[in-house]
Regions:
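Glycine-rich, small-residue loops and helix-cap segments
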Residues: 18, 94, 134, 188, ...
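Structural helix-boundary/capping segments
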Residues: 31, 35, 185-190, 194-293, ...
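An N-terminal boundary/leader segment
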Residues: 1-52, 313, 387
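Conserved hydrophobic/aromatic pocket- or pore-lining residues that grip, position, or stack substrates
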Residues: 29, 51, 100, 132, ...
Length: 500
């Protein structure tokens, strides 16, 4: 096995045994980046020199060897260094991890794949990055995404095309398409993504990797550029469920900068999944997910096969109903654009980002900067959001959508009184061809199975289930558990991973 093929657990075991160094591991990722990123396009930027300096520090601290360079030369990324105050026993110590390009890292670009932020360099770290730095990780470049996380294919990026590593004529999914392509194409050891309505889970399904959307509030949003503030969550995208458990443990926890994060202690997820089994697990089958017209036959076959394997492994199948699922798409596309229109109002060409050179007064500065900087899909959602929040329409649309959202959450609460987890398809189709879903409504349906759990704020995962028979495209299944039940979710996901 090549070093770039390793996951977090495998890499850390090899480092601990001295089979290879962090420098060798990081160099393998850099070499893979040069070999494959030209055709896949997962990364937007990669600070090779900074990553190698940190890898050298990790090796020196691990071996307690004398330093081989002055401190002034070994402090890249806004002063980040591994020489002191970091836990060299952490499973993330010296491990290169790719970062979705809306998560702020001090000293690195943060463009949200948008022309309006091209050239912007972050002056501070997001809380999730602070947490990872305490664990001694190595930032392994910025990966592409749909502009401001608005999309399901990464075709909406304003800065470049990302292709599916399993078929370069197809999309990697979105909005965390760069993260998924980097993991699935072995251009990184693991990656960070964000999920608003399915943006971790759907691309994970398309690119044959594990993706976890934590419960709303499990992971701090501070320093993550906001799309829809009541939905956004950062989560791991990895090569195994165990890797996801390791990474989620480092990401999660209370943050004074994000009032949605509780002070409850974060479990040791990796320890919790040891010996995970399907035996005795009550697995919910919701007709609203499994009896849907338009589902690709191969997705249905692989989902049915996954359910059968779970039952054979000892799971108890229980039929449940989530009756308000049919309203989830409409609710999401009222609430999310409404929040986006408010969040994106800050990008005005005055304080940072793109500033139009054609403006003659303040008003035209605002309008021209935004018109030149935002892409078509972002503009579409800003207009939708502004409309539903406008006088005379707020109660008719946004107010009612929030009421129905409460009913959707109640459906999940009732279901989890009867079952431990739900199993559903992750996306209605495998990865589709570029340009195949030009109609916005058709594109929005890619998140049909992932949006309801996002609205409910519960946790969910995508786990690889197999490949289509014809095109050999990866397909994932989704597991959903209740709010702050990530231990249970990861146990079920790991159990399925072991029997698939």
């Amino acid at each position: 096995m090549e070093l770039y093929e390793l996951g977090i657990k495998q890499a850390q075991e090899g480092l601990a045994k001295g089979e290879f160094s962090s420098v060798e591991l990081t160099q393998a990722i850099i070499d893979r980046y040069h070999e494959k990123n030209g055709e896949i396009g997962a990364y937007l930027t990669f600070d090779e020199e900074g990553a190698l300096k940190l890898a050298r520090e990790a090796d020196e601290k691990r071996s307690c060897a004398p330093r081989i360079a002055p401190a002034s030369q070994l402090a890249p990324l806004g002063g980040y260094s591994l020489t002191s105050g970091k836990d060299s026993a952490s499973p993330l110590f010296g491990i290169p991890i790719a970062i979705k390009d809306l998560i702020n890292v001090a000293g690195q670009p943060c463009t949200c794949a948008s022309k309006i932020l091209k050239g912007y360099v972050s002056p501070y770290d997001a809380t999730v990055i602070k947490n990872l730095k305490q664990n001694g990780f190595i930032p392994a470049g910025r990966v592409n995404m749909d502009e401001f996380a608005m999309g399901s294919s990464t075709e909406n990026s304003g800065l470049g095309v990302t292709r599916n590593p399993y078929d370069l004529t197809r999309v990697p999914g979105g909005s965390s398409g760069g993260s998924a392509a980097a993991v699935g194409g072995n251009l990184c050891i693991a990656a960070l993504g964000t999920d608003t309505g399915g943006s971790i889970r759907q691309p994970a399904s398309f690119c044959n990797c594990v993706g976890v959307k934590p419960s709303y509030g499990r992971v701090s949003r501070f320093g993550v550029t906001a799309f829809a503030s009541s939905l956004d969550q950062v989560g791991p995208m990895t090569k195994s469920v165990e890797d996801a458990a390791i990474l989620l443990k480092a990401l999660a926890g209370h943050d004074e900068m994000d009032g949605t994060t509780p002070k409850d202690p974060v479990p040791d997820y990796a320890k919790a999944i040891e010996g995970a089994s399907m035996k005795g697990v009550k697995l919910g089958l919701a007709k609203e997910y499994l009896e849907v017209s338009g589902m690709d036959p191969e997705v249905k076959r692989l989902t049915d096969e996954a359910i059968r394997k779970c039952e054979q492994a000892g799971a108890e199948l229980v039929e449940v109903s989530l009756p308000h699922t049919e309203y989830a798409m409409a609710v999401y596309y009222i609430i999310a654009p409404a929040e986006a229109s408010a969040n994106l109002a800050r990008f005005d060409g005055v304080r940072y980002g793109h500033r139009s050179e054609k403006a003659t007064d303040v008003f035209t500065l605002y309008t021209k900067s935004r018109a030149e900087g935002f892409g078509p899909e972002v503009k579409r959602r800003i207009i939708m959001g502004t409309y539903v929040l406008s006088s005379g329409y707020y109660d008719a649309y946004y107010g009612k959508a929030q009421k129905v959202r409460t009913l959707i959450k109640r459906d999940f609460d009732e279901a989890f009184k009867k079952v431990d987890a739900l199993i559903t398809p992750c996306a209605p189709t495998p990865a589709f061809k570029f340009g195949a879903n030009q109609d916005p409504l058709t594109m929005y349906l890619n998140d049909l199975y992932t949006i309801p759990s996002a609205l409910a704020g519960v946790c969910a995962s995508s786990v690889p289930a197999g490949f289509t028979q014809d095109a050999k495209l990866p397909v994932g299944v989704q597991f959903v558990c209740g709010g702050f039940e990530e231990e249970k979710l990861l146990k079920v996901s790991a159990a399925f991973e072991g029997i698939r």
